[in-house]
From Swiss-Prot:
Species for this entry: Drosophila melanogaster
Gene Ontology MF annotations: DNA binding; DNA-directed RNA polymerase activity
Signal sequence extent: none
Protein role: DNA-dependent RNA polymerases catalyze the transcription of DNA into RNA using the four ribonucleoside triphosphates as substrates. Common component of RNA polymerases I, II and III which synthesize ribosomal RNA precursors, mRNA precursors and many functional non-coding RNAs, and small RNAs, such as 5S rRNA and tRNAs, respectively. Pol II is the central component of the basal RNA polymerase II transcription machinery. Pols are composed of mobile elements that move relative to each other.
SMART domains tied to this protein: RNA_pol_Rpb6
Gene: Polr2F
Protein name stated in the entry: DNA-directed RNA polymerases I, II, and III subunit RPABC2
Location of the region described as Disordered in the Swiss-Prot/TrEMBL record: 1-24
Pfam families, A to Z: RNA_pol_Rpb6
């Protein structure tokens, strides 16, 4: 084949639409934003929805459970004080699970609402369903 056979091919790349870079950045920022936040017990200040006017569920979601366990296991691995009696456990995740089962984890879950307000829930206020 000669080079003349390929002269009529257009490989300039004009077939693709230009993508607005700002739109992609906005989408990525929205995806990275979580609807929950883990807060230390002393860090929950005012400004949220009062306990009597909460609208979210009193059940801990599997995502909140995973985040609480991961956060607490990391704290335990970094030599944080343990809130339960140990029966020979050395794995931080197992210790965190034991603390969660006894509702002794000193963490507050902050749930953000669509109107940018939030609700603070302590671990002992939430109902956990064993899966």
């Amino acid at each position: 084949m000669d080079d003349a056979d390929y002269d009529n091919d257009d490989v300039g790349g004009d077939d693709f639409d230009d993508v607005d870079e700002d739109v992609d950045e906005d989408i990525n920022q929205e995806e990275e934003a979580d609807n929950i936040e883990i807060i230390a017990p002393g860090g929950a200040g005012g400004g949220g929805v009062p306990k009597s006017k909460r609208i979210t569920t009193k059940y801990m979601t599997k995502y909140e459970r995973a985040r609480v366990l991961g956060t607490r296991a990391l704290q335990i691995a970094m030599c944080a004080p343990i809130m339960v009696e140990l029966d020979g456990e050395t794995d931080p995740l197992q210790i965190a699970m034991k603390e969660l089962k006894q509702k002794k984890i000193p963490i507050i879950i902050r749930r953000y609402l669509p109107d940018h307000s939030y609700e603070d829930w302590s671990i002992d206020e939430l109902i956990m369903v064993d899966n």
